[in-house]
């Protein structure tokens, strides 16, 4: 499972280094160094703006997710399903890190996520996300506002 946060940078060509522990998880837990980069679910900042980042899925996880979306396992109305396909499936790019662990983030995805020099890689269990550092600060603040207050639910999760 992907866990933890790593602050890193992206160069002018759009290359960034995937944290070593994330690369290790790709190979040891998912058995493949290939992965798919796509748009992450936007975070509503409650002020009319949204935080946009990227989600990175191991190839096998992506293939399962893609099948679920295509089969509409979430039973979404057609308009929402088509939006999901356009926002998640459409921009998805299969990638592999080079021998130094670097990956080229496709230009359209860099623009979408407003990636500047400093990035956060954030482990999310079976995937990891990539955020511009400024956006991630706002995402964290929103997460604190959204954090569950139900102590029984948190206890059931072991938190």
UniProtKB/Swiss-Prot annotation:
Disulphide bonds in the chain: none
Domain of life: Bacteria
Keyword check for RNA-binding: no
Principal place of residence: cytoplasm
Residue ranges occupied by any SpoVT-AbrB domain in the UniProt entry: 5-61, 92-135
Keyword Transcription found: yes
Family statement drawn from the similarity comment of this UniProt entry: Belongs to the MraZ family.
Subunit structure: Forms oligomers.
Name of the protein in question: Transcriptional regulator MraZ
Species: Trichlorobacter lovleyi (strain ATCC BAA-1151 / DSM 17278 / SZ)
């Amino acid at each position: 499972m992907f866990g933890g946060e790593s602050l890193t940078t992206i160069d002018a060509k759009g290359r960034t280094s995937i944290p070593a522990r994330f690369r290790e998880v790709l190979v040891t837990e998912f058995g493949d160094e290939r992965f798919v980069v796509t748009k992450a679910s936007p975070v509503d900042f409650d002020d009319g703006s949204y935080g946009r980042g990227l989600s990175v899925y191991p190839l096998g996880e992506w293939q399962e997710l893609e099948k679920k979306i295509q089969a509409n396992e979430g039973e979404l109305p057609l308009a929402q399903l088509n939006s999901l396909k356009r926002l998640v499936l459409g921009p998805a790019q299969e990638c592999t890190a080079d021998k130094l662990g670097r990956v080229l983030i496709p230009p359209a995805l860099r623009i979408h996520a407003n990636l500047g020099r400093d990035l956060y890689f954030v482990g999310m269990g079976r995937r990891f996300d990539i955020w511009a550092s400024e956006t991630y600060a706002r995402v964290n603040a929103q997460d604190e506002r959204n954090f569950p207050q139900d102590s029984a639910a948190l206890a059931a999760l072991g938190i």
